[in-house]
């Protein structure tokens, strides 16, 4: 004699089963997107957006970890080197977003005065004297050279680095920029180089808004309208944004279109051309502008 399979829901009606299923789904979703567990990192992490004129350089410091992303232009190399050297004598990871002079021109001085353990860069190439000379410096230094691959992660003390881009090959060096999400506990920043709309849209497709979300967003390409598209800015949804550019630069950076996007979204933004060096401090749970 066959036996009927036991109903795991007992004598619940179909409606009761449906209610239980809805409750289970709600609990599952809450577990997936609910509050993050309290951070276990110790100490603080500093995010220094260095005033290098018309260029980019960012120093990230925590106990046991130092990361520098880009080194600004050559005409600010001495001041950039002094700023970084006054805070550390070793760089765990130097990330060079792409081979444009306003991002790598000051790197030679860093190799001359600091110990650099690892260098991350894309396979983008240009035959400019600035870039070829830098490649020689990297080789002479003995630093470990890492090709940037989307999805790769690296650890420097309590700092976690995730490479988001480049995802594909590009003819445009700006779109070849290494985009890095920097995480400290439950806080994060995104450093973008000069990445433009094409790469931004690829990152949305690859990672989705949940993984792109961050607290601090370095506005790409010094605030150019060829970068920072609406969909990417919505995905990143930062609390703070930083624009690194020089007063009276010939490019008109930051472009008005970019400023309007920030203001429409009520994103608090800061500019190195107005404030000089900009520093944020994170305790792993909250990010604040340093006094």
Labelled PLM ranges:
Residues 2-291:
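Non-globular, low-confidence helical/coil segments that flank catalytic cores
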């Amino acid at each position: 004699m066959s036996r009927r399979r036991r109903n795991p829901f007992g004598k619940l009606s179909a409606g009761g089963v449906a209610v239980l299923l809805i409750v289970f789904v709600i609990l599952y979703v809450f577990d997936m997107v609910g509050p993050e567990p309290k951070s276990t990192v110790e100490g603080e992490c500093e995010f220094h957006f260095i005033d290098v004129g018309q260029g980019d350089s960012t120093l990230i410091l925590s106990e046991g970890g130092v990361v520098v992303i880009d080194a600004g232009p050559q005409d600010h190399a001495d001041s950039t080197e002094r700023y970084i050297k006054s805070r550390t004598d070793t760089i765990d990871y130097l990330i060079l977003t792409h081979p444009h002079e306003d991002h790598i021109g000051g790197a030679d001085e860093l190799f001359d005065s600091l110990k650099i353990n690892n260098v991350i860069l894309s396979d983008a190439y240009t035959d400019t004297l600035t870039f070829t000379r830098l490649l020689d410096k990297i080789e002479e230094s003995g630093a470990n050279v890492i090709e940037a691959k989307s999805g790769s992660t690296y650890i420097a003390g309590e700092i976690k680095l995730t490479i988001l881009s480049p995802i594909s090959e590009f003819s445009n060096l700006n779109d070849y920029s290494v985009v890095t999400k920097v995480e400290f506990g439950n806080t994060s920043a995104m450093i973008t180089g000069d990445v433009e709309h094409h790469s931004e849209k690829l990152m949305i497709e690859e990672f989705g808004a949940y993984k792109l979300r961050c607290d601090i967003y370095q506005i790409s390409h010094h605030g150019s309208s060829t970068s920072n598209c609406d969909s990417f800015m919505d995905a990143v949804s930062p609390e703070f944004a930083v624009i690194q550019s020089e007063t009276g630069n010939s490019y008109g950076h930051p472009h008005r279109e970019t400023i309007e996007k920030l203001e429409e979204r009520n994103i608090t933004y800061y500019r190195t051309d107005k404030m000089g060096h900009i520093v944020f401090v994170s305790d792993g749970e909250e990010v604040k502008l340093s006094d």
